[in-house]
């Protein structure tokens, strides 16, 4: 059993539509635990830094503006194979292609307003977690 951490964002469109609780319930139903969470309003510098790998791409400025458009929830999830399991729960980036029952199929408005972000690898998860959380802000919980 490989317990790992992953990083997740509930994006501005989902926060605005009061979907935080619904998304958290879906995460917890998978057996993953939320071990750190906070609400933020990203600055331009934070959004640009977080999405630096996309700098220079045609959608970069729009993505940064969207992520600054309202509060976001950032959280650390922990569980067995958390990166893969959370990506499966999220569904494909394009909600029209996302599996029925996935977060994006159920909650996303469009490819741009797709409600959630999740790390795509354990390495990305570690980098993204460290971008928003100090180690002492993460509170592992014993498994039941």
Curated annotation (Swiss-Prot):
Name the coenzymes or cofactors required: Mg(2+)
Cross-referenced CDD domains: NDPk_I (cd04413)
| Cellular localisation | Cytoplasm
EC number(s) reported in the record: 2.7.4.6
Metal-binding is among the record's keywords: yes
Q: Which reaction does it catalyse?
A: a 2'-deoxyribonucleoside 5'-diphosphate + ATP = a 2'-deoxyribonucleoside 5'-triphosphate + ADP; a ribonucleoside 5'-diphosphate + ATP = a ribonucleoside 5'-triphosphate + ADP
HAMAP family recorded for this chain?
NDP_kinase
Extract the PANTHER family matched here: NUCLEOSIDE DIPHOSPHATE KINASE (PTHR46161), NUCLEOSIDE DIPHOSPHATE KINASE DDB_G0292928-RELATED (PTHR46161:SF3)
What's this protein's name?
Nucleoside diphosphate kinase
